[in-house]
Structures are given as structure tokens and as C-alpha cells.
Design a protein with these regions (language model features):
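Glycine-rich phosphate-binding loop of ATP-dependent small-molecule kinases
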Residues: 1-192
Length: 192
């Protein structure tokens, strides 16, 4: 089983590459945004609790987020080939909580794949995406803020995963297929 954290700044291509990994390897996919929306939409107990925090403009506590992810992770069954964690963890305490949740099931993170893209390219991709899709969070000012949050709050996780011995740096420039070939190279070298 190969549980993988896909990691990178906004605009690095995490969603695009996750889709390609799912297609090639048959992995499950846990995107925190999608998971939260589904739990709330389905009216689960966890979803109702999460909605209370969201409605009050509060961040969802790490413990609740891990409970929600555990619920989804367990729904894949014991014979899945692995799961891609997309959008989680974002902080060291979240990474530690995810590690503990997986250990309780006799599992682990096999790799943290960091898609590394230069700042100028991220800005260009995100602003272009905003123009094409009409996403209001992809204008220049908001993009700069999102990248700053990534660098100050999320990027320190790279060192944590390096210490865990599962960090894999992947150059995120080039065509989608070029980048995916680099990811496949990393995944195929992982032991079961």
C-alpha cells in the first residue's frame, strides 16, 4: 500500500497530477475540501460539527479534521492500493496527527511528493487560471497572500517529511506528462 501526500504551493499542479496518479495506480483520493463538502452535504455527525465551525468563521480543529479523514480513509476498505492526501496536512501538528491515525491502522505515508515550481511560474499559472475560470481567489493580490501563507505556514512541513525519510522532490516545470513521468519514477521506486 502506497499512501502519498501530494504537496506544493497553490498552482503547482497537485490536482492535475493527483488525477493522473489515480488513473495509473488506482489510488483513492482524499481532498480535504471535497471531503468537508461531502460530509456537510450528507449531514453526517462529523459534517454537522464541522459546519458549526465553518458557520462561525472558525478553522476546523486538527483533531476533528483527522477524524473526518479517518472516516473517509476507512471507507476505502483494507484492500486499497493506497490513498493520495491532497490539501492535508498543512501544518506539522496535522502531519503528526495523520501519522498517528495511519499507525493505528498499521499503515504509513510511503511518500510526500513535493511539486517544486518557481514563484514567478506559480503567479503566472494562478493568475491565468483566474482569468480562464473566473475564480475570484486567483487575482494577483490574493495569489500573493496565498503564496505567502504557503511559505510561512505550510512549507515548513518539507523539513518534517525529510526527517521522516519520505520526502521526494519533483521538478514541477514542463508539460503535464513530463512532470507525471517524474512522479511515476518516484512512485515506482517505493517499496510496498
Amino acid at each position: 500500500m502506497k499512501n502519498i501526500v501530494i504537496f506544493g504551493a497553490p498552482g503547482a499542479g497537485k490536482g492535475t497530477q493527483s488525477d493522473k496518479m489515480i488513473e495509473k495506480y488506482g489510488f483513492g483520493h482524499i481532498s480535504t475540501g471535497d471531503v468537508l463538502r461531502n460530509e456537510i452535504k450528507n449531514g453526517t455527525a462529523l459534517g454537522k460539527t464541522a459546519k458549526g465551525y465553518i458557520d462561525n468563521g472558525q478553522l476546523i480543529p486538527d483533531e476533528l479534521m483527522v477524524d473526518i479523514l479517518a472516516h473517509v480513509y476507512d471507507s476505502f476498505g483494507s484492500d486499497h492500493k493506497g490513498v493520495i492526501f491532497d490539501g492535508f496536512p498543512r501544518t506539522t501538528p496535522q502531519a503528526e496527527a495523520l501519522k498517528k491515525m495511519l499507525q493505528e491502522r498499521g499503515h504509513k505515508i510511503a511518500a510526500m511528493i513535493e511539486l517544486s515550481v518557481p514563484e514567478e511560474e506559480l503567479m503566472a499559472r494562478l493568475i491565468n487560471r483566474g482569468k480562464e475560470s473566473g475564480r475570484s481567489d486567483d487575482n494577483e493580490e490574493t495569489v500573493k497572500k496565498r503564496l505567502n501563507v504557503y511559505h510561512t505556514q505550510t512549507a515548513p512541513l518539507i523539513d518534517w517529511y525529510k526527517k521522516e525519510g519520505v520526502h521526494h522532490h519533483v521538478e514541477g516545470l514542463g508539460t503535464v506528462d513530463d512532470i507525471f513521468a517524474r512522479i511515476v519514477n518516484e512512485i515506482d521506486q517505493l517499496s510496498e
